[in-house]
């Protein structure tokens, strides 16, 4: 029997995602819930994009993109929290600040990812969002995208 492309190139796409014009998804990718890809975004095969992510137009996704962030530039980099999307989905200001603090440690403390994960786990109160971010980083197969000022 013949197989369609969907059978050959498995893709998992979550609920309530918005893909603007000319967004392209390679095979074997995973995209979380409430993800927005602006126009002309290309997602490399085997990449994972977490929940509540916004990726700016014209971006090339080569690495995994952790939950709750905005990503842009070339190479694709962390540019902040998707605070507008999170507010629209009912996240409190306190919860958004907690998520921002996690990413400040990850991207601004000059720690490698393993050190940052250990620091966040030891110093920050457990929450579903904290645990989701840490699990995402631990499970990343391609590595997570860098911060804007980090070396690739």
Locations of regions flagged by a protein language model:
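Short alpha-helical linear motifs
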Residues: 40, 58, 140-144
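Conserved functional loop/turn residues at catalytic and ligand-binding sites
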Residues: 4, 64, 90
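Short coil/turn residues that cap or connect secondary-structure elements
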Residues: 9, 27, 45, 90, ...
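Terminal amphipathic alpha-helical/low-complexity segments used for targeting or macromolecular assembly
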Residues: 68, 74-152
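Single conserved hydrophobic/aromatic residue that forms the stacking wall/gate
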Residues: 1-9
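Hydrophobic face of beta-strands forming the core of extended beta-sheets/solenoids
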Residues: 7, 13, 19-21, 25, ...
């Amino acid at each position: 029997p013949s197989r369609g492309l969907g059978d050959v190139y498995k893709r998992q796409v979550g609920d309530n995602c918005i893909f603007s014009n000319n967004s392209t998804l390679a095979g074997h990718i995973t995209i979380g819930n409430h993800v927005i890809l602006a126009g002309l975004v290309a997602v490399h095969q085997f990449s994972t994009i977490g929940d509540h992510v916004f990726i700016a137009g014209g971006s090339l996704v080569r690495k995994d993109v952790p939950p709750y962030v905005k990503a842009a530039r070339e190479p694709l980099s962390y540019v902040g929290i998707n605070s507008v999307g999170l507010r629209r989905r009912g996240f409190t200001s306190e919860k958004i600040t907690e998520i921002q603090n996690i990413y400040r440690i990850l991207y601004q403390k000059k720690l490698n990812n393993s050190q940052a994960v250990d620091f966040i786990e030891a110093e920050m109160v457990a929450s579903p969002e904290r645990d989701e971010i840490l699990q995402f980083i631990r499970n990343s197969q391609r590595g997570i995208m860098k911060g804007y000022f980090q070396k690739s």
